[in-house]
Protein backbone atom coordinates (compact mmCIF):
# COMPACT_ATOMS: atom_id res chain seq x y z
CA UNK A 1 0.00 0.00 0.00
CA UNK A 2 1.41 3.36 -1.05
CA UNK A 3 1.21 6.78 0.60
CA UNK A 4 -1.73 7.91 -1.56
CA UNK A 5 -3.97 5.05 -0.85
CA UNK A 6 -7.48 5.12 0.46
CA UNK A 7 -8.32 7.57 3.24
CA UNK A 8 -9.32 4.68 5.38
CA UNK A 9 -5.79 3.44 5.19
CA UNK A 10 -4.17 6.70 6.21
CA UNK A 11 -3.50 8.03 9.74
CA UNK A 12 -3.75 11.75 9.88
CA UNK A 13 -2.24 13.86 12.62
CA UNK A 14 -4.46 14.64 15.58
CA UNK A 15 -3.64 18.33 15.58
CA UNK A 16 -2.70 20.95 13.08
CA UNK A 17 0.88 21.38 12.16
CA UNK A 18 2.71 24.05 14.04
CA UNK A 19 2.03 27.50 12.64
CA UNK A 20 -0.45 26.03 10.19
CA UNK A 21 -4.17 26.42 10.01
CA UNK A 22 -4.88 23.26 7.90
CA UNK A 23 -4.92 19.66 8.81
CA UNK A 24 -1.94 17.72 7.55
CA UNK A 25 -2.65 14.99 5.00
CA UNK A 26 0.74 13.46 5.30
CA UNK A 27 0.97 10.13 6.95
CA UNK A 28 3.18 10.07 9.96
CA UNK A 29 4.53 7.19 11.88
CA UNK A 30 4.03 8.87 15.26
CA UNK A 31 1.39 10.76 17.15
CA UNK A 32 2.08 14.42 17.76
CA UNK A 33 1.11 16.24 20.98
CA UNK A 34 -1.66 18.82 21.16
CA UNK A 35 0.83 21.56 21.96
CA UNK A 36 4.57 21.84 21.61
CA UNK A 37 6.69 21.14 24.64
CA UNK A 38 7.71 24.22 26.55
CA UNK A 39 11.17 23.79 27.95
CA UNK A 40 10.51 26.53 30.44
CA UNK A 41 7.56 24.64 31.86
CA UNK A 42 8.69 21.13 31.54
CA UNK A 43 12.02 19.67 30.59
CA UNK A 44 11.89 16.11 29.43
CA UNK A 45 15.52 15.79 30.27
CA UNK A 46 14.83 16.84 33.84
CA UNK A 47 12.26 14.22 34.61
CA UNK A 48 14.75 12.07 36.39
CA UNK A 49 16.09 15.04 38.37
CA UNK A 50 12.84 16.19 39.97
CA UNK A 51 13.32 17.31 43.58
CA UNK A 52 11.18 15.39 46.01
CA UNK A 53 8.50 17.19 48.02
CA UNK A 54 9.45 17.89 51.63
CA UNK A 55 6.59 15.73 52.82
CA UNK A 56 7.96 12.82 50.80
CA UNK A 57 11.42 13.05 52.34
CA UNK A 58 12.36 10.34 54.81
CA UNK A 59 12.54 11.45 58.44
CA UNK A 60 16.13 11.33 59.60
CA UNK A 61 15.53 13.29 62.86
CA UNK A 62 15.83 11.46 66.17
CA UNK A 63 12.48 10.38 67.52
CA UNK A 64 11.36 12.53 70.50
CA UNK A 65 9.05 11.20 73.18
CA UNK A 66 5.56 12.61 72.90
CA UNK A 67 4.50 14.97 75.67
CA UNK A 68 0.83 14.78 76.51
CA UNK A 69 -0.92 17.72 78.08
CA UNK A 70 -2.17 16.24 81.30
CA UNK A 71 -3.89 19.43 82.38
CA UNK A 72 -7.32 18.25 81.31
CA UNK A 73 -6.80 14.62 82.19
CA UNK A 74 -6.31 15.26 85.89
CA UNK A 75 -9.07 14.62 88.35
CA UNK A 76 -11.05 17.70 89.26
CA UNK A 77 -10.72 17.08 92.95
CA UNK A 78 -6.97 16.43 92.93
CA UNK A 79 -5.24 18.42 95.64
CA UNK A 80 -2.19 19.38 93.57
CA UNK A 81 -1.89 22.15 91.09
CA UNK A 82 -0.46 22.01 87.56
CA UNK A 83 1.27 25.19 86.53
CA UNK A 84 0.74 26.70 83.11
CA UNK A 85 2.78 24.76 80.53
CA UNK A 86 3.34 27.92 78.53
CA UNK A 87 5.45 29.17 81.40
CA UNK A 88 7.04 25.85 82.30
CA UNK A 89 6.78 22.60 80.37
CA UNK A 90 6.82 20.56 83.51
CA UNK A 91 4.22 19.19 85.89
CA UNK A 92 4.33 20.89 89.27
CA UNK A 93 2.60 19.02 92.07
CA UNK A 94 3.41 21.62 94.72
CA UNK A 95 0.83 23.99 96.14
CA UNK A 96 0.74 27.31 94.34
CA UNK A 97 1.91 30.05 96.73
CA UNK A 98 -0.73 32.37 95.34
CA UNK A 99 -3.41 30.04 96.68
CA UNK A 100 -1.83 30.16 100.13
CA UNK A 101 -1.83 33.95 99.95
CA UNK A 102 -5.48 33.95 99.00
CA UNK A 103 -6.25 31.66 101.92
CA UNK A 104 -4.51 34.09 104.24
CA UNK A 105 -6.70 36.91 102.98
CA UNK A 106 -9.81 34.81 103.53
CA UNK A 107 -8.70 34.17 107.10
CA UNK A 108 -8.38 37.88 107.69
CA UNK A 109 -11.85 38.44 106.35
CA UNK A 110 -13.23 35.70 108.59
CA UNK A 111 -11.67 37.42 111.60
CA UNK A 112 -13.30 40.68 110.63
CA UNK A 113 -16.69 39.07 110.16
CA UNK A 114 -16.30 37.31 113.49
CA UNK A 115 -15.79 40.65 115.14
CA UNK A 116 -18.85 42.04 113.42
CA UNK A 117 -20.89 39.16 114.82
CA UNK A 118 -19.55 39.91 118.29
CA UNK A 119 -20.54 43.52 117.92
CA UNK A 120 -24.08 42.52 117.04
CA UNK A 121 -24.07 40.19 120.03
CA UNK A 122 -23.08 43.07 122.29
CA UNK A 123 -25.87 45.16 120.83
CA UNK A 124 -28.41 42.39 121.43
CA UNK A 125 -27.27 42.07 125.03
CA UNK A 126 -27.53 45.80 125.59
CA UNK A 127 -31.00 45.80 124.03
CA UNK A 128 -32.17 43.09 126.40
CA UNK A 129 -30.67 44.88 129.40
CA UNK A 130 -32.46 48.09 128.50
CA UNK A 131 -35.70 46.26 127.79
CA UNK A 132 -35.72 44.48 131.14
CA UNK A 133 -34.24 47.35 133.12
CA UNK A 134 -31.17 45.34 134.08
CA UNK A 135 -27.98 47.00 135.34
CA UNK A 136 -24.94 46.70 133.12
CA UNK A 137 -23.01 44.88 135.82
CA UNK A 138 -23.91 41.30 136.66
CA UNK A 139 -22.72 41.89 140.21
CA UNK A 140 -25.37 44.55 140.65
CA UNK A 141 -28.18 42.22 139.71
CA UNK A 142 -30.62 41.56 142.49
CA UNK A 143 -32.72 38.42 142.72
CA UNK A 144 -35.46 40.31 140.87
CA UNK A 145 -33.07 41.11 138.04
CA UNK A 146 -31.98 37.50 137.85
CA UNK A 147 -35.60 36.35 137.68
CA UNK A 148 -36.26 38.79 134.83
CA UNK A 149 -33.30 37.50 132.87
CA UNK A 150 -34.29 33.85 133.36
CA UNK A 151 -37.90 34.55 132.35
CA UNK A 152 -36.73 36.46 129.26
CA UNK A 153 -34.43 33.63 128.16
CA UNK A 154 -37.21 31.09 128.71
CA UNK A 155 -39.55 33.18 126.59
CA UNK A 156 -37.00 33.49 123.77
CA UNK A 157 -36.40 29.73 123.68
CA UNK A 158 -40.01 28.67 124.33
CA UNK A 159 -39.21 27.16 127.72
CA UNK A 160 -41.46 26.90 130.74
CA UNK A 161 -40.01 29.37 133.27
CA UNK A 162 -39.36 28.10 136.78
CA UNK A 163 -41.49 29.22 139.68
CA UNK A 164 -40.23 31.32 142.57
CA UNK A 165 -36.74 31.61 141.11
CA UNK A 166 -34.71 34.22 143.00
CA UNK A 167 -31.07 34.20 141.93
CA UNK A 168 -28.72 37.16 142.09
CA UNK A 169 -26.27 38.02 139.33
CA UNK A 170 -23.31 36.77 141.33
CA UNK A 171 -25.06 33.45 141.90
CA UNK A 172 -25.86 33.18 138.19
CA UNK A 173 -22.20 33.60 137.24
CA UNK A 174 -21.23 30.81 139.63
CA UNK A 175 -23.85 28.33 138.45
CA UNK A 176 -22.86 25.28 136.41
CA UNK A 177 -24.99 23.46 133.88
CA UNK A 178 -26.11 20.97 136.52
CA UNK A 179 -27.21 23.84 138.74
CA UNK A 180 -29.35 25.23 135.93
CA UNK A 181 -30.82 21.80 135.24
CA UNK A 182 -31.85 21.51 138.87
CA UNK A 183 -34.05 24.60 138.66
CA UNK A 184 -35.14 23.94 135.06
CA UNK A 185 -34.79 20.27 134.05
CA UNK A 186 -36.27 20.78 130.58
CA UNK A 187 -33.99 23.65 129.55
CA UNK A 188 -31.23 24.15 132.08
CA UNK A 189 -28.58 23.41 129.49
CA UNK A 190 -30.03 26.10 127.24
CA UNK A 191 -29.95 28.73 129.98
CA UNK A 192 -26.39 27.79 130.88
CA UNK A 193 -25.32 28.06 127.24
CA UNK A 194 -27.04 31.42 126.90
CA UNK A 195 -25.21 32.70 129.97
CA UNK A 196 -21.92 31.71 128.35
CA UNK A 197 -22.98 33.62 125.23
CA UNK A 198 -23.52 36.72 127.33
CA UNK A 199 -20.05 36.32 128.77
CA UNK A 200 -18.60 35.82 125.31
CA UNK A 201 -20.24 39.03 124.17
CA UNK A 202 -17.89 40.90 126.46
CA UNK A 203 -14.78 38.82 127.13
CA UNK A 204 -14.12 37.57 123.60
CA UNK A 205 -14.47 41.05 122.22
CA UNK A 206 -11.68 42.35 124.42
CA UNK A 207 -9.43 39.38 123.71
CA UNK A 208 -9.95 39.77 119.97
CA UNK A 209 -8.01 43.05 120.00
CA UNK A 210 -5.61 42.50 122.88
CA UNK A 211 -2.57 41.92 120.68
CA UNK A 212 -3.66 43.82 117.61
CA UNK A 213 -1.28 46.48 116.29
CA UNK A 214 -2.81 49.26 114.21
CA UNK A 215 -1.48 49.23 110.63
CA UNK A 216 -0.24 52.26 108.76
CA UNK A 217 -3.22 54.00 107.22
CA UNK A 218 -1.34 55.36 104.18
CA UNK A 219 -2.61 53.56 101.10
CA UNK A 220 -0.89 53.13 97.77
CA UNK A 221 -2.42 54.67 94.68
CA UNK A 222 -2.58 51.29 92.99
CA UNK A 223 -4.79 49.71 95.60
CA UNK A 224 -7.87 48.04 94.20
CA UNK A 225 -11.37 48.76 95.43
CA UNK A 226 -11.55 45.44 97.26
CA UNK A 227 -8.19 46.08 98.95
CA UNK A 228 -9.29 49.59 99.85
CA UNK A 229 -12.46 48.26 101.43
CA UNK A 230 -10.47 45.67 103.37
CA UNK A 231 -8.03 48.37 104.48
CA UNK A 232 -10.89 50.57 105.71
CA UNK A 233 -12.26 47.67 107.77
CA UNK A 234 -8.78 46.99 109.14
CA UNK A 235 -8.36 50.63 110.11
CA UNK A 236 -11.73 50.50 111.81
CA UNK A 237 -10.57 47.52 113.82
CA UNK A 238 -7.32 49.30 114.62
CA UNK A 239 -9.19 52.30 115.97
CA UNK A 240 -10.63 50.13 118.72
CA UNK A 241 -7.30 48.77 119.91
CA UNK A 242 -6.12 51.92 121.65
CA UNK A 243 -9.38 52.00 123.56
CA UNK A 244 -9.41 48.41 124.74
CA UNK A 245 -5.74 48.49 125.77
CA UNK A 246 -6.48 51.21 128.33
CA UNK A 247 -8.62 49.00 130.56
CA UNK A 248 -7.76 49.08 134.23
CA UNK A 249 -6.86 46.16 136.44
CA UNK A 250 -9.30 44.39 138.69
CA UNK A 251 -11.23 46.28 141.31
CA UNK A 252 -12.50 43.24 143.13
CA UNK A 253 -10.33 40.12 142.71
CA UNK A 254 -12.80 38.06 144.72
CA UNK A 255 -15.37 38.21 141.96
CA UNK A 256 -13.71 37.48 138.63
CA UNK A 257 -16.06 38.07 135.78
CA UNK A 258 -14.23 36.28 132.97
CA UNK A 259 -13.07 33.27 134.93
CA UNK A 260 -15.62 31.07 133.16
CA UNK A 261 -14.08 31.76 129.78
CA UNK A 262 -10.43 31.90 130.71
CA UNK A 263 -9.89 35.61 130.10
CA UNK A 264 -9.00 38.42 132.50
CA UNK A 265 -9.55 36.47 135.73
CA UNK A 266 -8.80 39.52 137.87
CA UNK A 267 -11.14 41.99 136.19
CA UNK A 268 -14.63 42.44 137.51
CA UNK A 269 -17.45 43.24 135.15
CA UNK A 270 -18.00 46.63 136.76
CA UNK A 271 -14.42 47.71 136.06
CA UNK A 272 -14.77 46.49 132.50
CA UNK A 273 -17.83 48.62 131.90
CA UNK A 274 -16.47 51.65 133.73
CA UNK A 275 -13.04 51.71 132.12
CA UNK A 276 -13.96 50.59 128.63
CA UNK A 277 -14.83 52.87 125.78
CA UNK A 278 -17.71 52.84 123.37
CA UNK A 279 -16.85 51.38 119.98
CA UNK A 280 -18.24 52.74 116.72
CA UNK A 281 -20.65 50.68 114.71
CA UNK A 282 -19.13 49.25 111.52
CA UNK A 283 -21.98 50.65 109.49
CA UNK A 284 -21.11 54.10 110.78
CA UNK A 285 -17.39 53.72 110.22
CA UNK A 286 -17.33 52.43 106.68
CA UNK A 287 -17.02 54.92 103.86
CA UNK A 288 -17.24 54.53 100.13
CA UNK A 289 -14.37 53.06 98.14
CA UNK A 290 -13.19 56.47 96.99
CA UNK A 291 -12.78 57.59 100.57
CA UNK A 292 -15.69 60.01 100.70
CA UNK A 293 -17.90 60.30 103.73
CA UNK A 294 -20.81 62.08 102.14
CA UNK A 295 -23.24 59.48 103.49
CA UNK A 296 -22.42 60.47 107.06
CA UNK A 297 -25.43 62.06 108.69
CA UNK A 298 -25.85 64.03 111.87
CA UNK A 299 -26.62 60.90 113.83
CA UNK A 300 -23.40 59.26 112.65
CA UNK A 301 -21.24 62.32 113.26
CA UNK A 302 -22.45 62.53 116.84
CA UNK A 303 -21.39 58.94 117.40
CA UNK A 304 -17.83 59.59 116.21
CA UNK A 305 -17.42 62.88 118.06
CA UNK A 306 -18.49 61.42 121.38
CA UNK A 307 -16.58 58.14 121.29
CA UNK A 308 -13.73 59.43 123.43
CA UNK A 309 -16.05 60.62 126.18
CA UNK A 310 -18.60 57.83 126.30
CA UNK A 311 -17.93 54.82 128.51
CA UNK A 312 -18.62 51.22 127.66
CA UNK A 313 -21.47 51.28 130.15
CA UNK A 314 -23.06 53.99 128.02
CA UNK A 315 -22.52 51.80 125.00
CA UNK A 316 -24.49 49.01 126.62
CA UNK A 317 -27.09 51.48 127.75
CA UNK A 318 -27.47 53.49 124.57
CA UNK A 319 -27.09 50.78 121.98
CA UNK A 320 -30.35 49.31 123.23
CA UNK A 321 -33.56 51.12 124.03
CA UNK A 322 -34.11 53.94 126.45
CA UNK A 323 -35.33 53.29 129.96
CA UNK A 324 -38.37 51.09 129.61
CA UNK A 325 -41.48 51.24 131.82
CA UNK A 326 -40.01 48.27 133.71
CA UNK A 327 -36.92 50.33 134.48
CA UNK A 328 -39.07 53.26 135.60
CA UNK A 329 -41.01 50.96 137.93
CA UNK A 330 -37.81 49.64 139.44
CA UNK A 331 -36.58 53.18 140.03
CA UNK A 332 -39.77 54.00 141.91
CA UNK A 333 -41.63 56.52 139.77
CA UNK A 334 -42.10 57.81 136.28
CA UNK A 335 -41.59 61.53 135.84
CA UNK A 336 -44.16 63.79 134.21
CA UNK A 337 -41.79 66.51 133.10
CA UNK A 338 -41.37 66.67 129.30
CA UNK A 339 -37.78 67.70 129.67
CA UNK A 340 -37.09 64.39 131.40
CA UNK A 341 -36.94 62.74 127.99
CA UNK A 342 -34.02 64.93 127.01
CA UNK A 343 -31.93 65.07 130.16
CA UNK A 344 -32.13 61.75 131.96
CA UNK A 345 -29.58 60.01 129.71
CA UNK A 346 -25.99 60.96 129.12
CA UNK A 347 -23.84 60.03 126.16
CA UNK A 348 -24.74 59.55 122.53
CA UNK A 349 -28.31 58.68 121.58
CA UNK A 350 -29.38 57.58 118.11
CA UNK A 351 -32.46 58.99 116.46
CA UNK A 352 -34.23 55.63 116.27
CA UNK A 353 -33.66 55.16 120.00
CA UNK A 354 -35.02 58.63 120.69
CA UNK A 355 -38.15 57.86 118.66
CA UNK A 356 -38.64 54.63 120.57
CA UNK A 357 -38.46 56.55 123.82
CA UNK A 358 -41.14 58.96 122.68
CA UNK A 359 -43.31 56.09 121.46
CA UNK A 360 -43.09 54.43 124.86
CA UNK A 361 -44.51 57.57 126.49
CA UNK A 362 -47.74 58.15 124.56
CA UNK A 363 -49.31 60.34 127.24
CA UNK A 364 -46.71 63.03 126.73
CA UNK A 365 -45.66 62.64 123.08
CA UNK A 366 -48.59 61.15 121.15
CA UNK A 367 -49.03 64.51 119.42
CA UNK A 368 -45.51 64.14 118.07
CA UNK A 369 -45.24 60.43 117.23
CA UNK A 370 -47.48 57.45 117.95
CA UNK A 371 -47.75 53.73 117.33
CA UNK A 372 -49.87 52.61 114.39
CA UNK A 373 -49.34 48.91 115.06
CA UNK A 374 -47.22 48.15 118.09
CA UNK A 375 -46.87 44.44 117.31
CA UNK A 376 -45.58 45.11 113.79
CA UNK A 377 -43.44 48.03 114.91
CA UNK A 378 -45.26 50.52 112.67
CA UNK A 379 -45.39 54.14 113.83
CA UNK A 380 -46.39 57.51 112.44
CA UNK A 381 -44.82 60.92 112.86
CA UNK A 382 -47.80 63.14 113.66
CA UNK A 383 -45.81 66.37 113.74
CA UNK A 384 -42.49 66.49 111.93
CA UNK A 385 -41.79 70.01 113.18
CA UNK A 386 -42.39 69.00 116.78
CA UNK A 387 -40.23 65.90 116.43
CA UNK A 388 -37.40 67.96 114.92
CA UNK A 389 -37.69 70.48 117.76
CA UNK A 390 -37.56 67.75 120.40
CA UNK A 391 -34.61 66.10 118.63
CA UNK A 392 -32.80 69.44 118.45
CA UNK A 393 -33.30 69.94 122.17
CA UNK A 394 -31.98 66.46 122.86
CA UNK A 395 -28.90 67.02 120.69
CA UNK A 396 -28.50 70.64 121.85
CA UNK A 397 -28.82 71.91 118.29
CA UNK A 398 -30.94 74.97 117.78
CA UNK A 399 -30.70 74.69 113.98
CA UNK A 400 -32.18 71.20 113.82
CA UNK A 401 -35.00 70.82 111.28
CA UNK A 402 -36.91 67.95 109.74
CA UNK A 403 -34.75 67.93 106.60
CA UNK A 404 -31.70 67.01 108.66
CA UNK A 405 -33.71 64.57 110.73
CA UNK A 406 -35.13 62.84 107.65
CA UNK A 407 -31.62 62.21 106.32
CA UNK A 408 -30.92 60.15 109.39
CA UNK A 409 -34.14 58.22 108.87
CA UNK A 410 -33.16 57.43 105.28
CA UNK A 411 -29.80 56.14 106.45
CA UNK A 412 -31.65 53.61 108.60
CA UNK A 413 -33.06 52.04 105.42
CA UNK A 414 -29.55 50.91 104.48
CA UNK A 415 -28.77 49.73 108.01
CA UNK A 416 -31.88 47.56 108.28
CA UNK A 417 -33.36 49.45 111.22
CA UNK A 418 -36.35 51.21 109.66
CA UNK A 419 -38.24 50.80 106.40
CA UNK A 420 -41.41 52.05 104.80
CA UNK A 421 -44.35 49.66 105.25
CA UNK A 422 -45.77 47.76 102.29
CA UNK A 423 -48.75 50.08 102.17
CA UNK A 424 -46.86 53.33 101.91
CA UNK A 425 -48.29 56.27 103.79
CA UNK A 426 -46.88 59.68 104.47
CA UNK A 427 -44.68 59.83 107.58
CA UNK A 428 -45.40 56.20 108.44
CA UNK A 429 -42.41 53.96 109.14
CA UNK A 430 -41.75 50.47 110.42
CA UNK A 431 -39.07 49.15 112.77
CA UNK A 432 -37.42 45.95 111.55
CA UNK A 433 -36.50 43.06 113.88
CA UNK A 434 -35.01 43.15 116.45
CA UNK A 435 -35.62 46.88 116.76
CA UNK A 436 -39.38 46.37 116.80
CA UNK A 437 -39.31 44.46 120.11
Curated annotation (Swiss-Prot):
List where Polar residues composition bias occurs. 21-30
Question: Could you list the residue ranges forming a coiled coil in this record?
Answer: none
Per UniProt, residues of the PNT domain are: 120-202
Q: Where in the cell is it found?
A: Nucleus
What SMART domains is this protein classified in?
ETS, SAM_PNT
What keywords does the record list, in alphabetical order?
A: Activator, DNA-binding, Isopeptide bond, Nucleus, Phosphoprotein, Repressor, Transcription, Transcription regulation, Ubl conjugation
Q: Name one GO molecular function term.
A: DNA-binding transcription factor activity, RNA polymerase II-specific
> Which cysteines form disulfides?
none
Q: Name one GO cellular component term.
A: RNA polymerase II transcription regulator complex
The UniProt entry's GO biological process terms, in alphabetical order, are: cell differentiation; positive regulation of axon extension involved in regeneration; positive regulation of transcription by RNA polymerase II; regulation of transcription by RNA polymerase II
**Can you summarize the PTM annotation of this record?**
Phosphorylation is required for axon regeneration.
Cross-link (Glycyl lysine isopeptide (Lys-Gly) (interchain with G-Cter in SUMO)), chain numbering:
32, 83
Q: Where is the composition biased (Low complexity)?
A: 280-293
Family according to the record:
Belongs to the ETS family.
Q: What is this protein called?
A: Transcription factor ets-4
Amino acid sequence: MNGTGSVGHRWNSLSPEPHSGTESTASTPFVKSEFPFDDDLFGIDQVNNVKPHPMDMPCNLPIQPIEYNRRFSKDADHSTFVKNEIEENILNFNVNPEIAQDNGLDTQQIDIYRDLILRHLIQDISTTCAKLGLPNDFYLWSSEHGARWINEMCMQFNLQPPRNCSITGIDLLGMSQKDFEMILPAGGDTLHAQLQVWKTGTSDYVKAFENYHPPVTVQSSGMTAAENNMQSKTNWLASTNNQTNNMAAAENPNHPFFNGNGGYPNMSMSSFFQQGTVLPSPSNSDTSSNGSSQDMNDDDIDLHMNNSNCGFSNFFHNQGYMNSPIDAMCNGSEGDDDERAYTRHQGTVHLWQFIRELLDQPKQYSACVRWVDRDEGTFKIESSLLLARYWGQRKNRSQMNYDKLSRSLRQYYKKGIIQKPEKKQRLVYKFLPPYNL
